[in-house]
Amino acid sequence: MAFMLSLLMALVLVSYGLGGSLGCYLSENHMLHAQKNLKLLARMNRLSPHSCLQDRKDFGLPRKMVEGSQLQKDQAISVLHEMLQQCFNLFHTERSSAAWDNTLLEQLCTGLHQQLDDLDARLGPLMGQKDSGMGRMGPILTVKKYFQGIHVYLKEKKYSDCAWEVIRVEMMRALSSSTTLQERLKKMGGNLNSP
């Protein structure tokens, strides 16, 4: 359950920036790119999601809040970085280029890359201090497993237009579903260990 909350936390961070004590590390630009990336994903729609209902799949992203998190600040930062990197890797491929409008895809990849650069510049020293920490390995592995499932799905579906549409909707759902967790973080004042 803690791993799934870690994944949800990353989605909150990607969509809305870090709340409370984590927010001081991110620039306004980082948060603007997060919102812009979500809008770009929405604009990338080429097919009606209804035409691809037979291709839907549950990739294991939890739909509701998990209570009682023990997620630490450094875990949240690591998960955010991994989510951004995996998203970038997913959309920055030759097969992805064939599926999407290249202008929108390039803007999305640029926005994700700018977020990664911003995180690296601001959080490099913080992440370097505990980079080998075992506490982050579980949440990071959960993110990698989630994206590995997405890559396997695309390969099984032979990178069809419907498969890419399912993935686009999945990424939209993942980013959009983080609103409740964001509100919880605001109520806790950024303390992820609060009840």
Swiss-Prot record:
Q: Which GO terms describe its biological process?
A: defense response to virus; female pregnancy
Any single Pfam family the record assigns to this protein? Interferon
> Domain of life, per the record?
Eukaryota
A GO MF term: cytokine activity
Q: Where is the signal peptide?
A: 1-23
Q: What is its main location?
A: secreted
Q: Where can this protein be found? A: Secreted
List, alphabetically, the SMART domains matched.
Answer: IFabd (SM00076)
A single GO cellular-component term on record = extracellular space
Q: Which UniProt keywords apply?
A: Antiviral defense, Cytokine, Disulfide bond, Hormone, Pregnancy, Secreted, Signal
* Keyword Signal recorded: yes
Chain segments annotated as transmembrane: none
What S-S linkages are listed for this chain? C52-C162, C87-C109
Q: What does this protein do?
A: Paracrine hormone primarily responsible for maternal recognition of pregnancy. Interacts with endometrial receptors, probably type I interferon receptors, and blocks estrogen receptor expression, preventing the estrogen-induced increase in oxytocin receptor expression in the endometrium. This results in the suppression of the pulsatile endometrial release of the luteolytic hormone prostaglandin F2-alpha, hindering the regression of the corpus luteum (luteolysis) and therefore a return to ovarian cyclicity.
Family membership: Belongs to the alpha/beta interferon family. IFN-alphaII subfamily.
Name the record gives this protein: Interferon tau
Per the UniProt entry, what species is this protein from, by scientific name? Giraffa camelopardalis
Q: Name the gene for this chain.
A: IFNT
